[in-house]
Amino acid sequence: MRDLYKTDYEVGQDNIRTWGMDMHNPVFIISSILVLLFVIGTLIFPSEAKQAFDGSKGWSIDNFDWLFLVAGNIFVLFCLLLILLPVGRIRLGGVDAKPEFSLLSWFAMLFAAGMGIGLMFWSVAEPAAYYSDWWGTPLGVAPQTPEGADLALGATMFHWGLHPWAIYAVVALSLAFFSYNKGLPLTIRSAFYPFIKDHSWGWFGHVIDVVAVMATIFGLATSLGFGAQQAAGGLSYLFGIDSGINTQIAIIIGVTSIAIISVVRGLDGGVKLLSNINMTLALVLLLFVIAVGAGLGIFNEIARTAGSYAQNIIPLSNWIGREDEKFYNGWTVFYWAWWISWSPFVGMFIARVSKGRTVRQFIIAVLLVPTVVTLIWMSAFGGAGIDQMQAGVGELADGVSEVSLALFQMLANLPWAMWTSSLAIVLVLVFFITSSDSGSLVIDSITAGGKLDAPVPQRIFWATMEGLIAGALLFGGGADALGALQAAAITVGLPFTLVLLAMCVALYMGLSHERRYVLGEGRGAKGDSAAAESSA
């Protein structure tokens, strides 16, 4: 039992080294070919592709809404359980491992990779949409009422709070533990080693990693495309700049160029630096909105949002007997499928930067800290938007007309609107750069067979691919092409839900083995156990 996780497989042993690259055979080759075929097909038949993928996405959501909701609840409970159990003392990388990044830089990278851009896009638009019945109201509450306002904030927190971060935490902890503590490659397949042992390095593992690569690059490319549209829309709204395809392509070129520079510089010189800049700029904007908006009333807004979140988290996470099917299928199940499809990317990136933390520290940081930050952010921005709607102030008073402009419409009614809106555009772009460069590092690691130090040309290849895909889809197929690829990424959420549930079982098996046979709480040396506990 002590040698249960020993394997003769060596990281990179299946790799092909040519053209300055270090490519896993066959994951790199198959992923590249399939991505190319999907993009070409979508460019040639954008409307047909969108219709087909929308159909598969709709089928997944309509028939398996219960599975997404149940799985989301399981992930949250599983993470909370790990905080309480003795396995929480296990340190990622072994008892002597030290964190590679300061707490502040670590938090900044977690947040920027996880959902920073989403908070810019939806922090005003989503509560406003729920309050005005743009696409259903949570739990069927009457729109444009005080109760509807409270529930709009609570439901928004539900979609951006514990559940999505629990999804990321399961993947991230599984990858980090099996890589740093068991010596397995840092790829999705390694999480299944407890079940299938060395078969993980065969075609079963190849398929899992290929799907993870495709979900990641499709998700990143579509987000980059939609982000370019939002940034272009913001520039047009503020400065009258044409928001057409030329502006959008220029934004993509700029974002991709900076992302390439960042991935060349690596985690320390690129991703960490941009994430710290992100956190600083976001904090400035947040403090401004609080100061000129709610002021000291922000504490009431936070209590209002937190209270609604706590009161409604169970009803919102349950599908039985609900009459708001339009809402929970259109919003909640969609979000859960999207978070799950993004989990290979975000989870692997979090694993990359989390060595040296204990399991307990890891779960608290990944699950609770972002939830608290999101609570403050949503209370400030979402609360300000709803307050303007209730007071009949500005364009938001007429409801949500253009989701991408809701943030700018809210800022337009505050002092120094031009400056703060310009800062918001910069934040949108920098958040996209951090998503692109961290995503490129993740895809690079998977397609290099789990290597953390793949050659620079390989990093450049994937960062360039993301920009080319986004630009080509915008230029050739517009919103239909982007929507098709987004629907394809979300469709991956259904099979990956089962993958994540299996990960929970495998992770617990691995942690239990580590506690008993490696840390010595069963038969091994007591000193390591004491060291682990004292350092937790």
Per-segment meaning from a language model:
Residues M1-P146, V264, L287, C504-L511, ...:
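N-terminal alpha-helical transmembrane segments of multi-pass membrane transport
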Residues D3-K6, I30-I44, L69-L77, F239-R265, ...:
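Transmembrane alpha-helical segments of multi-pass small-molecule transport proteins
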Residues D8-T18, Q51-K57, L85-L103, A128-G154, ...:
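Flexible loop linkers connecting adjacent transmembrane helices
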Residues N15-G20, F45-S60, C79-E100, A152-H159, ...:
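Membrane-water interface regions at transmembrane-helix termini and the short interhelical loops
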Residues R17-P26, I61-D65, V95-A113, L153-L162, ...:
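Transmembrane-helix boundary/entry motifs in multi-pass membrane transporters
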Residues W19-L43, V76-C79, M115-L119, H159-Q229, ...:
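Helix-loop-helix module between adjacent transmembrane segments
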Residues L34, L67-L84, A282-G293, V373-G383, ...:
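Hydrophobic alpha-helical segments of multi-pass membrane transport proteins
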Residues S200-R357, I364, V369-S421, L429, ...:
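Membrane-embedded translocation segments of transport machinery
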